């Protein structure tokens, strides 16, 4: 297992090393942060406005798995319909605005990065958005239809389904956003390895613990309690963990130091 004290020390050293780079004062950092937050909020507002134009189609989109199973949503409270339109527009707007918001994050952190680390910006943004959309796609076309079928047609076949808009929206977003965020695992491993907090050897050595943790996470975000559904959640996450090990091997400081030492040795000869 990882030593928490050692991990914290490595993280602190990485932050301290960047703090020593020539840059802005604290007040300048705060002012820059304020600007980036304002710009991100503007992009989010524009994304919301664009999504609102198509909110009827977005509502049909999230209802499709239910309609394909012969079910429909029920309005329990007078505000349910409007709340659904607002929620789907917010989520859709956030997805539309995410590349621009990530760019604002990049503009804020770029002054504190070395030139060799800045080359990761385009792959980072593309991978972050791509992995989230892949997780959301997997959730919508695979997990959600299976969940609807199991809960309504298998366990609920003896009952009359009265599905409220609020409960279904929460259920839908927990699957789509939960898997979208979970699919960002290689990005998290990338940064942990880049700063030397974890190594590919550590990740591989503790693979069995990762399996337990991934199945625990799958059990938390999975709406079904059966083992098959948990495996549907967990197997892609295990594959992404293995991808993360490859990413860690690629960016870990020990590999970069070894390459630099080899280059210096060859230059000496």
Q: What are these model-predicted stretches?
A:
Residues 1-269:
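Membrane topogenic/interface segments and analogous intrinsically disordered interaction regions
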